[in-house]
Amino acid sequence: MAQAAAVAKPPAPPRRRRASATPRRLPYLLIAPAALLMLGFIAYPVISVFYYSLQEYNPTKPWRNGFAGLDNFVHAFTEDPLFWDTLVFSAKWVFVEVGLQLLFGLALALIVNQTFVGRALGRALVFSPWAVSGVLTSAIWVLLYNSQTGITRYLADVGIGSYGTSWLSDTSTVFPAAVVADLWRGVPFFAILILADLQSVSKDLYEAAEVDGASRIKQFWHITLPHLKDAIVLSTLLRAVWEFNNVDLLYTLTGGGPAGETTTLPLYIANTSVDAHNFGYASALTTVAFVILLFCSMVYLRLSKFGGEDK
């Protein structure tokens, strides 16, 4: 009977092996080397800047090198008028450039969004300046502003201005001249992003608005503009950060001159470190710029709903 009971006992279920954690960890292991490398490229310069901002470090005067505490920051905020001048000009440059680029970019996007013959070619020509580097843009506009062979001579031929006028050497004209040069390259950025958003607006909305008797202006104000709001806000903040860091175009176009009229804070930092070899003070100025850009980045991430929040 015991034997029969033993035979009737159901077999034990097969033991399952624990799933290996390796497949789940494999993606993280694969990206770990690249992530650590990128972290090193980002973290090391940031830490070095913070460290040297507390030092007096000038390779040409090694006997003066040493710990300076907050002296560099105190000097910047209380004793260096150039710091405040460049900071104010940076704000002016960002405000004017981003504002004009947004307005012209919006108008350009609305134009190329229409149906017309040769639209594809027109879009390619309109967007092509965005692919040009800042240095090459400066080279183009330096030639255009040349007092002997540029547009100033042709304007003088028709009675506008005088011969021999150099817009990049005159304190009264250098700012608008630099603004126009950067507009040529920056406007397509807004036009591309806004055009991409324009093409996602349903045509049914415009047809319904026309049936209701809404004018083109009302359609733009109540349909187009609300739809573009998020794209405009985020692209404006992103472009503001880029314009604040615009060194290549201004450096090659004006060099910060004349008389420091077009020197932004990043350009002042470059001159302080490269020309004056005052790396300690330049690091302190870089820290200030880092805090400003960090604040702008936090605003950008907050408005873009960073972290998976629903729009």
Regions found by a protein language model. Give the residues of each.
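A structural signal for multi-pass alpha-helical bundles of membrane permease subunits
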Residues: P23-K311
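Short, Lys/Arg-rich, polar N-terminal cytosolic tail immediately upstream
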Residues: M1-T22
